[in-house]
Regions:
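Short, solvent-exposed segments of well-ordered alpha helices
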Residues: 2-10, 29-36, 68-72, 98, ...
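Generic structural signal for well-ordered, non-transmembrane alpha-helical segments
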Residues: 6, 10-13, 17, 36, ...
Length: 122
């Protein structure tokens, strides 16, 4: 799939929605906390990316709102999104645009820290 900035931000909005849903339905306290931190941070990171992108390129247009497919396993869901982010990052933003690429690095860091907590601390 060819990603544009609006698709990328929409993917992050979906991650927030899925993580929040699992956060509210888990019986694991550590999973509850890890996902709470994720959904709080990912929406701020999405906002930072969107505003910075629009500062450089102008308005990106309507955000693509994705719907979740079956998300029985939050680790698989987040890992799949992380894989997509790492594959599409240079389609979304030119590799030479270090300011926007750094914001994508920050987004990747949020995913990796959450995956660590879910895999090894939950």
């Amino acid at each position: 799939m060819m990603y544009k900035a609006a698709d990328f931000v929409g993917m992050l909005f979906l991650a927030r929605d899925v993580a929040h849903s699992v956060h509210l339905n888990t019986r694991s306290y550590s999973k509850h906390i890890a996902l709470g931190i994720f959904y709080d941070r990912i929406i701020g990171a999405a906002d930072d990316f969107a505003e910075t992108y629009q500062g450089r390129h102008g308005l990106m247009g309507p955000i693509t709102l994705h719907s979740a497919t079956k998300t029985a396993n939050i680790i698989d869901f987040l890992q799949g999104q992380l894989d997509d982010i790492e594959k599409c990052r240079y389609e979304v933003v030119d590799k030479s645009d270090s300011s926007l690429q750094q914001l994508i690095d920050n987004i990747i860091e949020i995913y990796l820290r959450t995956l660590y907590k879910l895999r090894f601390l939950a």
